[in-house]
Swiss-Prot record:
Site keyed Transition state stabilizer: positions: 315
Entry keywords, A to Z: Calcium, Carbohydrate metabolism, Chloride, Disulfide bond, Glycoprotein, Glycosidase, Hydrolase, Metal-binding, Pyrrolidone carboxylic acid, Secreted, Signal
Functional note: Calcium-binding enzyme that initiates starch digestion in the oral cavity. Catalyzes the hydrolysis of internal (1->4)-alpha-D-glucosidic bonds, yielding a mixture of maltose, isomaltose, small amounts of glucose as well as small linear and branched oligosaccharides called dextrins.
Protein name per Swiss-Prot or TrEMBL: Alpha-amylase 1A
Annotated signal peptide: 1-15
Length: 511
C-alpha cells in the first residue's frame, strides 16, 4: 500500500509538467492578440492538420481600455475583473473556440494574469473592456469583488510602494510591479477568487495556464491556488488530468529569485534560451554554432523536463522583459528561421512558437518608441486575420507559424519525438549538423562560405525531401532532394547565400 501511495503522489505531482497535448503533438503556438473567432478557424483549417499541439491565447479576462497611448498591447495585463470579455471576444466566443479547437485535438492554454489588477494611476470609471466600474485609487473592483483589504499595500516596505530593488526577494513579491496593484495572494479569499476564475476556464475546456509574473508571487501562494483547481474537462481529457502549468519567471542569473524556486508548481519559462541562442546565431561575443554541442543543461539552463522554451515572446520581441538586443524575431527573418529550426529539432524543453503582428517600429536612442502599439485594428476593434492565396496572413498579422520552414519543423519535432540526440557534426565554426535517432537529421550553414560534405545521418537508405526548401506533396518533393545511401550517409551542399541556409529531413519526408 505504501508503494502504491508513493506512486500515486508522485503521479499527482508530475501531472502539471505534462502538456496535455494530443499524442504525437509536441509544440504550442502563441497567437498573440488574436480574436477567439480567428483562433477557432485556425485550429480547424491549419493547426490541427499541420500537427500543432495547442495555442497560448492572450488574457481572456476583462481589462482596462487604455486610450493614452491608444489601446496598447499591455492593457491586456491590467485586469479589472475575471469576466471573459476583451477585444479578443466575449465568453460565448471563447467557449466556441475552446470547444472547436479541442474537437480537432488542439489545446488552449490561457495567459493567467493573477499577480495584480490594473495600475494605481489609472482613473476610476468604466473605461474597461466589459464596462465594469473600477476605482484603483480606493482599491475598489466591485466586479470581482476586491477591496482595499485584498491588496499588499500594508505588506510592501518600499517608499514608493513599487519594486525598487530586484536583489530583495521580498519586495519583488510584496510590492507593485510598475505600479500594478499587487494582490494579497496570502489571503484565502483572494486565492479563492483567482481559483474560481481559473476553474471556470478549466470547466470550459482549457488545458493549462501560462502564469504571468510568477516571479512576483511567492511560490507557496501559487501552489495554494493550484491546489484549488479542478481536474480537466473529461469530455476531452483523460479522467483525473491536471492543468499544464508554466510559470513566467525571468531568471538570467544574478538575482536571489531562481527559476528552481518554482519547479514544485510546474514548468518555468527558460529566458536564457532565446537570449543565448540569439547571441550564437548572430555570432556575437565570439559565439559559434559549434558550441551548441552541449546545448541545454550544459549551458546552465534548467532541467529539460522543467523548461518551456521559445526563441522570442510577446515581451522581448519588442524590447520588454528579458534578453535584450540579442533576441531574434520575425524582423530578422533569415536568422530567426534558423533559430526556430534549431529549437524545434533539439530535444531540450517543451517548445512554444511565436505568432506576431507587425507594428511601426521606430528607434530613438536605441529604444523603439512604438513598442506599445497594440494589434492591427480599426479604431480599437481588432482586425480579422485574413489568409492570402499563398497561405500567408494579411492585415499586418505576421503568422510566423505559417512560414513553411517553421510549420514543417513543428512537424519534424513530432516525427522525432522521444528519439535521442545523435550524430553531431561541427566544423569548429558555424557549420553544424545533428540527428534524432533514426527519425530525423538537420544541417546548418551559418558560416560565410559554402558547406559541402558527406555526413552520417543515422537514417534508413532512400530519397528524402528537404522540408525547409520545400514540401513532400503526393510523393513528390517541391524542394531539395537528399539521397541517403545504405550506410546512412548523405551528401549535403548549402551555399552561404541560400535563402535558408539549413536542410532538414525526417522519416515522413522520405519519398
Amino acid at each position: 500500500m505504501k508503494l502504491f501511495w508513493l506512486l500515486f503522489t508522485i503521479g499527482f505531482c508530475w501531472a502539471q509538467y505534462s502538456s496535455n497535448t494530443q499524442q504525437g503533438r509536441t509544440s504550442i503556438v502563441h497567437l498573440f492578440e488574436w480574436r477567439w473567432v480567428d483562433i477557432a478557424l485556425e485550429c480547424e483549417r491549419y493547426l490541427a492538420p499541420k500537427g500543432f499541439g495547442g495555442v497560448q491565447v492572450s488574457p481572456p479576462n476583462e481589462n482596462v481600455a487604455i486610450h493614452n497611448p491608444f489601446r496598447p498591447w499591455w492593457e491586456r495585463y491590467q485586469p479589472v475583473s475575471y469576466k471573459l470579455c476583451t477585444r479578443s471576444g466575449n465568453e460565448d466566443e471563447f467557449r466556441n473556440m475552446v470547444t472547436r479547437c479541442n474537437n480537432v485535438g488542439v489545446r488552449i492554454y490561457v495567459d493567467a494574469v493573477i499577480n495584480h489588477m490594473c495600475g494605481n494611476a489609472v482613473s476610476a470609471g468604466t473605461s474597461s473592456t466589459c464596462g465594469s466600474y473600477f476605482n484603483p485609487g480606493s482599491r475598489d473592483f466591485p466586479a470581482v469583488p476586491y477591496s482595499g483589504w485584498d491588496f499588499n499595500d500594508g505588506k510592501c516596505k518600499t517608499g514608493s510602494g513599487d519594486i525598487e530593488n530586484y536583489n530583495d526577494a521580498t519586495q519583488v513579491r510584496d510590492c507593485r510591479l510598475s505600479g500594478l496593484l499587487d494582490l494579497a495572494l496570502g489571503k484565502d479569499y483572494v486565492r479563492s477568487k483567482i481559483a474560481e476564475y481559473m476553474n471556470h476556464l478549466i470547466d470550459i475546456g482549457v488545458a493549462g495556464f501560462r502564469i504571468d509574473a510568477s516571479k512576483h508571487m511567492w511560490p507557496g501562494d501559487i501552489k495554494a491556488i493550484l491546489d484549488k483547481l479542478h481536474n480537466l474537462n473529461s469530455n476531452w481529457f483523460p479522467e483525473g488530468s491536471k492543468p499544464f502549468i508554466y510559470q513566467e519567471v525571468i531568471d538570467l542569473g544574478g538575482e536571489p529569485i531562481k527559476s528552481s524556486d518554482y519547479f514544485g508548481n510546474g514548468r518555468v519559462t527558460e529566458f536564457k534560451y532565446g537570449a543565448k541562442l540569439g547571441t550564437v546565431i548572430r555570432k556575437w561575443n565570439g559565439e559559434k554554432m559549434s558550441y551548441l554541442k552541449n546545448w541545454g543543461e550544459g549551458w546552465g539552463f534548467m532541467p529539460s523536463d522543467r523548461a518551456l522554451v521559445f526563441v522570442d515572446n510577446h515581451d522581448n520581441q519588442r524590447g520588454h522583459g528579458a534578453g535584450g538586443a540579442s533576441i531574434l524575431t520575425f524582423w530578422d527573418a533569415r536568422l530567426y528561421k534558423m533559430a526556430v529550426g534549431f529549437m524545434l529539432a533539439h530535444p531540450y524543453g517543451f517548445t512554444r512558437v511565436m505568432s506576431s503582428y507587425r507594428w511601426p517600429r521606430y528607434f530613438e536612442n536605441g529604444k523603439d518608441v512604438n513598442d506599445w502599439v497594440g494589434p492591427p485594428n480599426d479604431n480599437g476593434v481588432t482586425k480579422e486575420v485574413t489568409i492570402n492565396p499563398d497561405t500567408t496572413c494579411g492585415n499586418d498579422w505576421v503568422c510566423e507559424h505559417r512560414w513553411r520552414q517553421i510549420r514543417n519543423m513543428v512537424n519534424f519535432r513530432n516525427v522525432v519525438d522521444g528519439q535521442p540526440f545523435t550524430n553531431w557534426y561541427d566544423n569548429g565554426s558555424n557549420q553544424v549538423a545533428f540527428g534524432r535517432g533514426n527519425r530525423g537529421f538537420i544541417v546548418f550553414n551559418n558560416d560565410d562560405w559554402t558547406f559541402s560534405l558527406t555526413l552520417q545521418t543515422g537514417l534508413p537508405a532512400g530519397t528524402y525531401c528537404d522540408v525547409i526548401s520545400g514540401d513532400k506533396i503526393n510523393g513528390n518533393c517541391t524542394g531539395i532532394k537528399i539521397y541517403v545511401s545504405d550506410d546512412g550517409k548523405a551528401h549535403f551542399s548549402i551555399s552561404n547565400s541560400a535563402e535558408d541556409p539549413f536542410i532538414a529531413i525526417h522519416a515522413e519526408s522520405k519519398l
